[in-house]
A protein has these predicted regions:
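Helix-loop element at the rim of GNAT/NAT acetyltransferase active sites that forms part
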Residues: 25-39
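Conserved GNAT acetyl-CoA-binding A-motif
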Residues: 97, 104-117
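Conserved beta-hairpin
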Residues: 40-66
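Conserved beta-strand in the GNAT
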Residues: 54, 61-70, 75-82
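Conserved catalytic-core motifs of GNAT/GCN5-like acyltransferases
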Residues: 113-115, 125, 130-147
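Conserved N-terminal entry element of GNAT/NAT acetyltransferase domains
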Residues: 1-18
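Short acidic/glycine-enriched loop/turn segments that link adjacent beta-strands
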Residues: 47-49, 72-74, 138-142
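Conserved acetyl-CoA pyrophosphate-binding loop and the N-cap/start of the following alpha-helix
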Residues: 87, 91-99
Length: 150
């Protein structure tokens, strides 16, 4: 199923295996090239079991992505949220986040947690997340843990 952003018309859906190269390319552009995250930290073993969601622009190019990692006890974490610089603020990230929430609910998840970059805190607060704890550094970038009940 595809989730469409309320105001933007941006849509998001669960990624297929064939989408993986485009997801990796986007995450590399955003995290490694723009933000200076070491390449060896960008991909990890959790990618193999995660539910990946993506959004495409009008040309069909993957422009936003995120992943859902299921945990025990009806919880999950969301991570690797990335949007191409050309579409930031246009609803693609919100569409991806909404579809990740929908996928979590379908899997019986009641609460999601994420490690938000401090610069994106407002984005997550608008989506119903609350900060928990102090800021900390992850991969050289200031983060804060945020939680939302679904």
């Amino acid at each position: 199923m595809t989730r469409v952003g309320r105001r933007s018309g941006a849509a998001a859906s669960v990624a297929a295996a064939a989408d993986w190269p485009e997801i990796v390319a986007l995450r590399t552009r955003v995290f490694v090239e723009e933000q200076g995250v070491p390449p060896e930290l960008e991909q990890d073993a959790a990618d193999a079991t995660a539910v990946h969601v993506l959004s495409r622009d009008t040309t069909g190019r993957v422009v936003a992505t995120g992943r859902l990692l299921l945990r025990d006890g009806g919880t999950a974490s969301i991570g690797r949220m990335a949007a191409d610089a050309s579409v930031r603020g246009r609803g693609h990230g919100a569409a991806v986040l909404g579809e990740l929430h929908r996928q979590a609910v379908l899997r019986g998840v009641a609460e999601v947690e994420l490690h938000a970059q401090v610069t994106a805190r407002g984005f997550y607060e608008r989506a119903g997340y609350e900060a928990h704890g102090d800021e900390y550094e992850e991969a050289g970038i200031a983060h804060v843990t945020m939680v939302r009940r679904l």
